[in-house]
Amino acid sequence: MNVDGPFTASCPVVLASGSPRRQEFLRAMGVPFSVDTAGASEPEPVEGEAAVAYARRAACAKTLPVARRHAAACVIGADTVVALDGVIMGKPAGHAHALSMLRALAGARHEVVSACCICLPGNAQEPVVLHAVTSVWMHRWDDAALKAYIATGEPADKAGAYGIQGIGAFLVSRIDGSWSNVVGLPLTELLTELQRRGVVVPSGAQTAEQDGHAPDVRD
């Protein structure tokens, strides 16, 4: 797909995620990409596993199988984890579970960790893994407001049972760190790394044909 934005890619890019939100971010940045997902279920956290360690492991589990199918591409996968007091909160199993999760988050500070796994062309065995952590404070809403939010259906597929980019924005009173990270992709960190590796370049930069140099996709 060809889209307009501040960046373009010097090699094929494959997003190993079916998340519409992650796709929207790359699309808005102008990075052409295709989508291919691993198809397997996400790994479960190990008892006592830290949120950062789990997010990084899960991101790689989603990315590596796809990278093996696209050796000539840069393959990017991601995972987002919500943790309260160091305990990982997954996606709600139903309305009652969502209410329990939102009650726990209401009036408290929690962390959102998004990790990215990047497999450079021809180098799927040595992925680059990065992550970002954002602190989020949720307003102490009463059960009536929480139940009304759950009734919208939005929490069903969201880590922590809320989506800051949608209706769930009203739940959050403050964040410290990257907003895109809470949505599901640490965009600044990801683009910085991709530009450093030569995978993406600013759209206004000279093309390889103009300056006589081939793109440098560094491992």
Swiss-Prot record:
Record-marked site positions (Important for substrate specificity): 21, 80, 165
Cofactor(s) required, per the database record: a divalent metal cation
Coiled-coil residue spans: none
Catalytic activity: dTTP + H2O = dTMP + diphosphate + H(+); UTP + H2O = UMP + diphosphate + H(+)
Pfam families: Maf (PF02545)
GO cellular component: cytoplasm
GO molecular function: dTTP diphosphatase activity; UTP diphosphatase activity
Main localization of the protein described in the UniProt heading: cytoplasm
Catalytic residues (UniProt): 79
InterPro entries for this protein: ITPase-like_fam, Maf-like
Record's keyword terms, sorted: Cytoplasm, Hydrolase, Nucleotide metabolism
Subcellular location field: Cytoplasm
Gene3D superfamilies linked: 3.90.950.10
CDD domains in the cross-refs: Maf
Record GO biological process: nucleotide metabolic process
HAMAP family: Maf
Role according to the record: Nucleoside triphosphate pyrophosphatase that hydrolyzes dTTP and UTP. May have a dual role in cell division arrest and in preventing the incorporation of modified nucleotides into cellular nucleic acids.
Stored PANTHER family: BIFUNCTIONAL DTTP/UTP PYROPHOSPHATASE/METHYLTRANSFERASE PROTEIN-RELATED (PTHR43213), BIFUNCTIONAL DTTP_UTP PYROPHOSPHATASE_METHYLTRANSFERASE PROTEIN-RELATED (PTHR43213:SF5)
UniProt-listed NCBIfam families: maf, PRK14362.1
Name assigned to this protein: dTTP/UTP pyrophosphatase
Protein species of origin: Oleidesulfovibrio alaskensis (strain ATCC BAA-1058 / DSM 17464 / G20)
Lineage: Bacteria, Pseudomonadati, Thermodesulfobacteriota, Desulfovibrionia, Desulfovibrionales
